[in-house]
Design a protein with these regions (language model features):
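Hydrophobic alpha-helical segments, chiefly the membrane-spanning helices
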Residues: 209-213
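Conserved, carboxylate-rich catalytic/transport cores that coordinate ions
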Residues: 1-197, 201, 205
Length: 213
């Protein structure tokens, strides 16, 4: 990640393998960030933390992991791959396991409305709420401490993401179709996505794989 970040900042040519591909990826990254800004997914930005211990496993320090644009590039590409996988399987008319994130329930929304300042961030047309409203709510916080409190309240509001054969979209990412093709934790549901794509592209290979599964 560090080498790729240096490549991005210094625009050094041919200092890394696949320099041309990296240049193209950074151009794509700019487009993905623009699309992300227009889409306005939920932005909570909880830091990833690392715990340092001594030989006796006593905690010495807890530090935040510093992420750069290279980390975010990979994250955006993973999201794009997951969208593409979901759309590809859907277009082929096959059954699919979508990774859905339901809109918060009416009961949770009513509770959330009573939080200081939250009411102005929610549309007045019924109980409809979007990631845009929640982002506005977080941004309305006065100071870091209040911002963290608001983010914790949003966590309580959100439903749990799950797998479903019904495509109900992903509330947090503000996407119409999403699945777990690039999930770092390989649940069997994720394997099904891979098998479905193999069935589309290489059906004979799927038969060989089936014997080993």
């Amino acid at each position: 990640y560090e080498d790729v970040e240096i490549f991005r900042l210094e625009k050094t040519v041919n200092t890394l393998p696949y320099s041309k591909s990296l240049t193209d990826l950074w151009d794509l990254y700019d487009l993905l960030l623009k699309e992300k800004k227009d889409r306005s997914p939920l932005k909570l930005d909880f830091p990833e933390r690392v715990i340092s211990t001594d030989v006796d496993d006593s905690v010495l320090d807890i530090t935040n992991v510093k992420k750069n644009n290279s980390n975010q590039l990979v994250e955006e590409l993973m999201i794009l791959a997951n969208i593409s996988a979901a759309e590809t399987i859907k277009k082929c008319g096959m059954g699919n396991l979508f990774r859905i994130h339901p809109t918060p329930s009416n009961e949770k929304i009513e509770t959330f409305r009573n939080i200081r300042g939250a009411g102005s961030s929610i549309t007045k047309n019924g109980n409809k709420i979007t990631s845009v409203h929640l982002n506005e709510f977080v941004n309305s916080a006065k100071g870091v401490d209040e911002r963290e409190i608001y983010k914790q309240e949003i966590i309580k509001l959100l439903e749990q993401a799950r797998y479903s054969t019904k495509n109900d979209g992903h509330f947090g990412l503000n996407l119409k179709s999403y699945t777990h093709f690039t999930s770092p934790i390989r649940r069997y549901a994720d394997i099904i996505i891979h098998l479905s794509l193999i069935h589309i592209s290489e059906p004979t290979r799927l038969r060989r794989i089936s014997y080993a599964v």
